[in-house]
């Protein structure tokens, strides 16, 4: 194998790690909605996490959703009262094709 090709393959593998869906969140009262679009050729698994402001209000996580290439998804969660914070986590989905 040529040394230049090995570096190129490593750079491509590192580049693949940044294939995550573009997401934005919206908070309306006690409800949080995440709007995600995946413009990349790899599937991204996203999950919405909501932290409620009140100590007695239970924090929640949505079920993970796989967003395929060019796909769009909306995830929602809520608190009983005010929302303290919300964020999205991303997890790459392994390529199901053998040999990759």
What annotation goes with each model-predicted range?
Residues 13-100:
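Post-signal peptide N-terminal regions of Sec-secreted extracellular proteins
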Residues 1-13:
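Secretory targeting and sorting signals
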């Amino acid at each position: 194998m040529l040394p230049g090709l090995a570096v190129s393959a490593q750079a491509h593998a590192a580049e693949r790690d940044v294939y995550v869906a573009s997401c934005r969140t919206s908070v309306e009262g006690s409800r949080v909605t995440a709007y995600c679009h995946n413009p990349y050729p790899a599937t991204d698994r996203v999950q919405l996490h909501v932290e409620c402001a009140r100590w007695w209000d239970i924090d929640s996580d949505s079920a993970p959703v796989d967003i395929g290439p060019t796909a769009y998804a909306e995830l929602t969660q809520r608190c009983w009262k005010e929302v303290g914070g919300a964020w999205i986590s991303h997890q790459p989905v392994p390529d199901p094709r053998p040999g990759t």
